[in-house]
A protein has these predicted regions:
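Feature for soluble, non-membrane regions of globular proteins
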Residues: 1-197
Length: 197
């Protein structure tokens, strides 16, 4: 099986001013494409070449000899979710089922947002901030580099890339501002809610 770079579900200038066309051109067209190309090259004649992307991520995470496969498969999986988690004119009202779950598991939507921004801000170096389902409960977590909650048996439903290439053109070193803009103005809450099942 060969993996392909998915098309963005919006025009590359549609997320401005919160994420510029320049950022998307580099992030999607260069960085994400490189992960896909590297993954396909690493999987040639490999026992995992016909496995699903999710299976590759989980299996490669448990085997140090597959670090290259894990890094590129993880980044490919993470970015597929990341692109879907955003939309033009995002943010806004959260669907009632998801809002209820956030209120129940975090105390309030605002407390969830604070926890998410804190996770992304305190992720040292490159990585991701996540909202995931862990044994039926919504949790905020973070992961370094290409890792994600799948490797810990959780289901990620919202992910934000905190590698510098995801925000440095638009926000420079202001990662908290990027995370706030992501939650308030970019997130496709309908998509996130659809992942609850």
């Amino acid at each position: 099986m060969s993996f392909e770079l998915p098309s963005l579900p919006y025009a590359n200038d549609a997320l401005a001013p919160y994420m510029s066309a320049e950022t998307l051109d580099f992030h999607h067209g260069k960085h994400h494409q490189t992960y896909v190309t590297n993954l396909n090259n690493l999987l040639k004649d490999h026992e995992l070449q016909s496995s699903s992307l999710e299976d590759i991520v989980v299996k490669a995470s448990k085997d140090a000899s597959m670090t290259g496969i894990f890094n590129n498969a993880g980044q490919h999986w993470n970015h597929i979710l990341f692109w879907q988690c955003m939309k033009p004119n995002g943010g806004g009202p959260i669907p009632s089922e998801l809002e209820g779950r956030l209120n129940n598991d975090f105390g309030s939507v605002e407390q969830f947002k604070e926890a998410f921004i804190q996770a992304g801000t305190t992720q040292f170096g490159s990585g991701w901030a996540w909202l995931a389902i862990d044994n039926g409960k919504l949790v905020v977590t973070k992961s370094p580099n290409a890792s994600n909650p799948l490797v810990d048996g959780m289901k990620p439903i919202l992910g934000c890339d905190v590698w510098e290439h995801s925000y440095y053109i638009d926000y420079r070193n202001k990662r908290p501002d990027y995370l706030k803009a992501f939650l308030d103005s970019l997130v496709n809450w309908e998509f996130v809610a659809s992942q609850l099942d």
